[in-house]
A protein has these predicted regions:
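Residues within well-ordered alpha-helices
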Residues: 59-61, 106, 129, 143
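Residue-level detector of structured alpha->beta connecting loops
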Residues: 43, 67, 111-114, 137
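Short, well-structured N-terminal submotif of metal-dependent ribonuclease cores
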Residues: 1-46, 56-63
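Active-site neighborhoods of divalent-metal-dependent phosphate/nucleic-acid chemistry enzymes
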Residues: 76-131
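PIN-domain endoribonuclease scaffold, especially VapC-family toxins
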Residues: 35, 44, 48-97
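Acidic, PIN/NYN-like endoribonuclease modules and their adjacent C-terminal/linker elements
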Residues: 2-3, 122-154
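A generic structural signal for short hydrophobic patches within well-formed alpha-helices
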Residues: 14-15, 51, 146
Length: 154
């Protein structure tokens, strides 16, 4: 069902619907209703590493209720991850932390399927998704950019 997918969403963007976040669902109902619709239609997906990063029970439930398509990690994605962490952006993963970074897998999956990344991470940090996407010519946007792209006016 990847053929209909257009976007891959990061944990930071998913979390932004929480009541204490910038794009809280109680205020941005139409945005989240549209995202719900696009997740249900598999236009917005995520990858298994990003899904496993989600610790928030409300977001886990939201993903399940919406039927979030979670793309698996395969050899091509692994190869893309290797390229990202060894040549494109060595700062993306903190190897001293001794844990996997869902960010590299998210970007690698976006590259494989030609997806646009949706994230709320800072565009100015070298350890963040937007900088790496820029280096790899992968389209990346925050939720405001997403709203503009789909023509949503509040």
């Amino acid at each position: 069902m990847v053929s209909v997918s257009k976007y891959i969403i990061d944990t930071s963007a998913m979390l932004s619907q929480k009541s204490d976040e910038q794009y809280r669902r109680t205020v941005y109902r139409s945005l989240w209703n549209k995202i719900d619709e696009m997740v249900q239609g598999h236009e917005i997906v995520t990858c298994s590493e990003t899904a496993s990063e989600v610790q928030d029970d409300d977001i886990k439930k939201w993903m399940a209720v919406q039927g979030m398509q979670v793309l698996p990690i395969d050899d091509e994605v692994q190869d893309n991850v290797r390229e990202i962490v060894t040549t494109v952006n060595k700062d993306l993963v903190d190897f001293k932390a001794n844990k996997s970074s869902g960010d590299a897998f998210l970007i690698a999956t976006a590259k494989k399927y030609g997806l646009t990344v949706i994230t709320e991470e800072s565009v100015n940090s070298p350890r963040k998704i937007p900088m790496t996407c820029q280096k790899m010519d992968i389209k990346c946007m925050n939720l405001l950019g997403f709203m503009e792209e789909i023509g949503m006016a509040l």
